[in-house]
């Protein structure tokens, strides 16, 4: 919430360089948030459509098709699995310090 973020920055004495605290900060954060949302949504749309486009261009069999959303899910699960494996390795590394 840009309004809440601007208020919190103002209360804590923080500011964005070149932007006055208060309403100007709120408008700036809103503008940046809209830009990031637009870029992110365009990127996700391209990722979702690209696999279908390549499958149709390469004339692959229907069994080889994978949708963009499926690709996003697979990558998300793979990244989460890597994080969990890394945390387990770190946990094992620190187990020697506990004993």
Swiss-Prot record:
Protein family per UniProt: Belongs to the SecY/SEC61-alpha family.
Role played: The central subunit of the protein translocation channel SecYEG. Consists of two halves formed by TMs 1-5 and 6-10. These two domains form a lateral gate at the front which open onto the bilayer between TMs 2 and 7, and are clamped together by SecE at the back. The channel is closed by both a pore ring composed of hydrophobic SecY resides and a short helix (helix 2A) on the extracellular side of the membrane which forms a plug. The plug probably moves laterally to allow the channel to open. The ring and the pore may move independently.
Membrane topology: Multi-pass membrane protein
Subunit structure: Component of the Sec protein translocase complex. Heterotrimer consisting of SecY, SecE and SecG subunits. The heterotrimers can form oligomers, although 1 heterotrimer is thought to be able to translocate proteins. Interacts with the ribosome. Interacts with SecDF, and other proteins may be involved. Interacts with SecA.
GO (cellular component) term, any one: plasma membrane
Protein name in the entry: Protein translocase subunit SecY
Pfam families reported for this sequence: SecY
DNA repair as UniProt keyword: no
GO biological process: protein transport
InterPro entries associated with the record: SecY/SEC61-alpha, SecY_dom_sf
Protein encoded by which gene: secY
Cystines in this chain: none
Primary location class: membrane
Membrane-spanning segments: 38-58, 60-80
Keywords: Cell membrane, Membrane, Protein transport, Translocation, Transmembrane, Transmembrane helix, Transport
Compartment(s) where it occurs, according to its Swiss-Prot or TrEMBL record: Cell membrane
């Amino acid at each position: 919430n840009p309004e809440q973020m601007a208020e919190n920055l103002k209360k804590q004495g923080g500011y964005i360089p070149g932007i006055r605290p208060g309403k100007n900060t709120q408008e700036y954060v809103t503008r940046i948030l809209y830009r990031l949302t637009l870029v992110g949504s365009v990127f996700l749309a391209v990722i979702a459509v690209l696999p279908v486009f390549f499958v149709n261009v390469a004339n692959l069999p229907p069994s080889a098709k994978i949708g963009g959303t499926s690709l996003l899910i697979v990558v998300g699960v793979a990244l989460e699995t890597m994080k969990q494996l890394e945390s387990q390795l770190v946990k094992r590394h620190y187990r020697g310090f506990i004993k």
